[in-house]
Amino acid sequence: MDFLNYAFMQRALLAAVLVGITAPAVGIYLVQRRQALMGDGIGHVAMTGVGLGFLLSWSPVWMATAVSVVGAVTMELIRWYGKTRGDIALAMLFYGGMAGGVMFINLAPGGSNANLTSYLFGSLSTVSESDVTAICLLAAFVVVVTLGLRRQLFAVSQDEEFARVTGLPVRALNLLTAITAAVTVTVAMRVVGLLLVSALMVVPVAAAQQLSRSFAATFAIAVAIGVTVTTGGTVTSYYQDVPPGATIVLLTIGAFIALSVLAAPLARRRARALAAAQPAGDPAECAIPATRAAGDEVGV
């Protein structure tokens, strides 16, 4: 535990815990909306914000947040009103964001692509006190939104038409989800890196779904996995001198594989128990449900 004696490791671990909480908390809604790659798109757009921050001598974290929010809102507007296919528009934001980041950081006084590396792949030693303050504020916003509006966000993510019929402001909630995802990307970029943050938003959720189909349980398990792999990856990167972002993502994928292997026999045992409990010849076995509830895929 000697790493706790160093201030930079204390800051890095605090940031890692916040990232482990916020990334899966937002990712569960993106997975339900089948927008798992949205984090990648926002991460590329955030590069432009980082480059602008260096160019204008402003905080790269806050500038990346502002640019990411604009990019996320633009993605939603294109999805609603654009005549260009959604995947083409997303690709343009991908490459435009990356090109803008490289260009701006090279135009900055004394700037070079090396300055961008810690934001692309994460860095423990460069997490400053101001970064931690910004991360704490942004993480608080993400937690309030994802927990406070969990029922509304789940309804919209699961079935927009059903949510609209019940009177929910679907477009406003979609925009809020996109903005929250953008904020989460900037929260995670100092620890995981912009190019790898999407994995931490998606893979813990996919791993949690191997164990549970309930929304609440999936949410809790995904956050637990997120915190475990981010703190474990941060400590491992300190002792082994390896990139923290890559370490965290590899641990996350390892957790997914391990839970998938463990979940298979559990699923078979559950199926056998259900079959044994079901009376032979019960008409319910052949019954066709009349309606599809909004929570059929992942129970609330």
What would you call each of these model-derived segments?
Residues V242-V300:
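Cytosolic-side transmembrane-helix boundaries in multi-pass membrane proteins
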